[in-house]
Amino acid sequence: HEPDISFVEAATEEIIPFLKKGNLYIIESTSPIGTTEKMQKLIYASRPELEGHIHIAYCPERVLPGNIMLELVENDRVIGGVDEAATQKAISFYSKYVKGEVHGTNARTAEMCKLVENSSRDVQIAFANELSLICDKADINVWELINLANKHPRVNILQPGCGVGGHCIAVDPYFIVSDYPMESKIIGTAREVNNYKSFWCAEKIQNEKLKFELAHGRKPSIALMGLAFKPNIDDLRESPAKYIVNRVLQNDSNSEYFIVEPNIDSHNVFKLTNYNVAIVDADIVVYLVAHEEFKNHKIINDKVILDFCGINK
């Protein structure tokens, strides 16, 4: 989980020969604190004549997969230069097309801002996921509990799931934990909770499978609903659902599994099944991702349902 800025370094080295006085150099990639300053040193080491004559800044992207082009224009942006002149130069550039508000700061604060945004989400999701673990032991419906708790005007608990995925929220907290391990206890623990939730879901599926075998004298057929890292997208990066499916299928070639992901046509590892086939033929139906396609189908009553994402809440 150590940060790797080699791609930022490689990209910077590629453009160094082409930089000219007056140019504006901007990093948008999520990066550890101090990366912009490191790239400044890298540039000046190769091109000392540019020192004080180019503008270097950091402006993290804030976009939602599936809605990128709109959010590039509409969302507020945080922009931090290595000095005030660089900040103002970058603000002038982004103001040409960004309709959201543009907020100026310094490079280190802008870098940390991006990490904090995603780490904050991770911590909040970890609280919801931890509640789901507690409620499972306490025989409480976690979805009802959260709905009732959120009736309080100053409470806003997020929804639990089968973990946290994607190439942002599941990754960015490590940039803070790696550099400040003693000071980031909550952030680090949140990562552990969210990773554990995926393992816990896989164990719940295995336990339900064994219960079915004991009750019926045969192995169940199991539908695993969803592979994407969040609802209604086709992105599988760092997906907890994909981890769970891999773990459940591991060393179990005798059982019949129906893997459903409506947002992709095929997968290089998993054989995909149509939802309508899976929901009819499976004995156990496991909801891993809250895709709209799953919400729009009626649940068949004679199935064993494991709902980790609130499809039936």
Regions found by a protein language model. Give the residues of each.
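Structural/interface elements that position substrates and couple domains in central-metabolism enzymes
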Residues: H1-K313
